[in-house]
């Protein structure tokens, strides 16, 4: 994972041999840590959980927050293709679901 991507993605239990990557988008006001227990639960099933860490949350408190979902999507769209050819999916809760949906649409364009 590149330096730019590593700020955005928190991987609590890296699995280089995982069969699937699940990108998890937190609800508004939350950070990547809300999905850390998922990483342990999915590990036995060959799934690597990558939690999205937005600016101005948890370990990124000094980073300026982004003002819109479009800005978040624009920042993330180029970071997902990092040489990882395994299948992946998105999960988002509340605002995170909207970000995940808009990111999926942006990747199709």
Q: What is each of the regions a protein language model found here?
A:
Residues 1-109:
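Domain-scale detector for complete catalytic domains at protein termini or as standalone homologs
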